[in-house]
């Protein structure tokens, strides 16, 4: 099975032909992968943030940055500056390792998996994928998680349109649904 980096080198001529790029630098490429999770219960339980951080470190192989509330919301007992989530940005080799794991190990483990949505692209060709439960990742021991936690994976590309981004991710091995 080819890795994502190897698939990209094979995909460049195909993308160049499909979108009629004159210069090889016009071909879209991967920039970064951002993994984000909200830990709303961290407002009342500081241990929740620590366990979520340990899970993100296991999944991404890199320590996350704590995201903080921008403004106070009285109904949620939230004050500006309180920790409410975690995010980690993967670039370079860690990004490719994570995408290999995501495309070929994690997504096939999702129950009743029929492929990822074709419509989760923004207007610039970036793709966002949400997980309701982080236990589908192989590094997470299902017996040790306190609470299933959702997370979001955003794949950022240099594509200009959603069609370019979809073709790039398709050639890299992302399993899209057949609808």
From Swiss-Prot:
Gene Ontology MF terms in the entry: rRNA binding; structural constituent of ribosome; tRNA binding
GO BP annotation list: translation
Domain of life of the native organism: Bacteria
InterPro entries with a match to the protein in the record: Ribosomal_uL5, Ribosomal_uL5_bac-type, Ribosomal_uL5_C, Ribosomal_uL5_CS, Ribosomal_uL5_dom_sf, Ribosomal_uL5_N
PROSITE patterns, sorted: RIBOSOMAL_L5 (PS00358)
Keyword RNA-binding: yes
Keyword Magnesium carried by entry: no
GO CC terms in record: ribonucleoprotein complex; ribosome
SUPFAM superfamilies: RL5-like
Disulfide-linked positions: none
Pfam families linked: Ribosomal_L5 (PF00281), Ribosomal_L5_C (PF00673)
Keywords of the record: Ribonucleoprotein, Ribosomal protein, RNA-binding, rRNA-binding, tRNA-binding
Function noted in UniProt: This is one of the proteins that bind and probably mediate the attachment of the 5S RNA into the large ribosomal subunit, where it forms part of the central protuberance. In the 70S ribosome it contacts protein S13 of the 30S subunit (bridge B1b), connecting the 2 subunits; this bridge is implicated in subunit movement. Contacts the P site tRNA; the 5S rRNA and some of its associated proteins might help stabilize positioning of ribosome-bound tRNAs.
Family: Belongs to the universal ribosomal protein uL5 family.
Subunit-structure text: Part of the 50S ribosomal subunit; part of the 5S rRNA/L5/L18/L25 subcomplex. Contacts the 5S rRNA and the P site tRNA. Forms a bridge to the 30S subunit in the 70S ribosome.
UniProt name for this protein: Large ribosomal subunit protein uL5
Species for this entry: Dehalococcoides mccartyi (strain ATCC BAA-2266 / KCTC 15142 / 195) (Dehalococcoides ethenogenes (strain 195))
Annotated gene: rplE
């Amino acid at each position: 099975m080819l890795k994502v980096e190897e698939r990209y080198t094979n995909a460049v001529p195909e993308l160049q032909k499909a979108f009629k790029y004159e210069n090889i630098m016009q071909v879209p490429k991967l920039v970064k992968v951002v993994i984000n999770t909200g830990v709303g219960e961290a407002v009342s339980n500081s241990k929740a943030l620590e366990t979520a951080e340990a899970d993100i470190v296991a999944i991404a192989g890199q320590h996350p940055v704590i995201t903080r509330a921008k403004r106070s919301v009285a109904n949620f007992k939230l004050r500006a500056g309180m920790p409410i989530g975690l995010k980690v940005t993967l670039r370079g080799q860690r990004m490719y390792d994570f995408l290999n794991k995501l495309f070929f190990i994690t997504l096939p483990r999702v129950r009743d998996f029929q492929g990822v949505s074709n419509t989760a692209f923004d207007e610039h060709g970036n793709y966002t994928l949400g997980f309701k439960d982080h236990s589908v990742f192989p590094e997470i021991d299902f017996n040790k998680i306190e609470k299933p936690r959702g997370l979001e994976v955003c794949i950022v590309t240099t594509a200009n349109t959603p069609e370019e981004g979809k073709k790039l991710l398709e050639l890299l091995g992302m399993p899209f649904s057949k609808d």
